[in-house]
Amino acid sequence: MNASWIVANMEWVLIVCGALTATMLFPMIAPRLAFKQMFGEVAEGPLGELLTRNWGQMIFATGLLLIYAAYHEEARLPILVFASFTKLTFAALVLSNGGRYGRKLAMPIAVGDLSMVGLFVWYLLAVS
C-alpha cells in the first residue's frame, strides 16, 4: 500500500482506533475486574483503585481525542504524537516484564497499541 491510502482513510483509522482506545473506560467503572482480566492481578487498596480509575479515564480521554482528530485535521499532529507516546509507553512496560503478562489480556492490548502507532507514524510520514 502506498502513502495515499493512509491519507485517504485516516478519518476511519482514527475513528476505529479511538473507539477501541475508548473501551478502556472499563477500568474506571470496574477497576478490580478490569485489572484482573488484563493483568491477572489487582492493584489493592483505595490507592490502587484510585489510580486504576484515573488510568482508565485518561486512556478513555485519549480515545476521544483520536475520534476528535478524525474530524479536525489541524489537531492531528499533537493528538497523534500524544497517543503514540502513551501507547508506546504501555507496550514497552508490558513487554519489558518478560513473560509475566504474555498470556494475559495486556499482551494483545500492547500489540494492538503498537499496530495503532504504526498506522499513526505511517500517516505522519505521508503528510510530512
Model-derived features: where do they sit?
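Interfacial loop at the N-terminal end of multi-pass membrane proteins
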Residues: 2-7, 30-52
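Short juxtamembrane and helix-loop transition motifs at transmembrane-helix boundaries
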Residues: 38-47, 68-77, 99
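Non-cytosolic membrane-interface motifs at loop->transmembrane helix junctions
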Residues: 42, 78-82, 102-112
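Hydrophobic alpha-helical membrane segments
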Residues: 79-93
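Core segments of alpha-helical transmembrane spans in multipass integral membrane proteins
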Residues: 19-28, 47-70, 84-88
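Cytosolic juxtamembrane helix and N-cap/initiation of the first transmembrane helix
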Residues: 1-20
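Membrane-helix boundary connector in multi-pass membrane proteins
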Residues: 74, 91-108, 125-128
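Membrane-water interface at the C-terminal end of transmembrane alpha helices
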Residues: 27, 97, 116-128
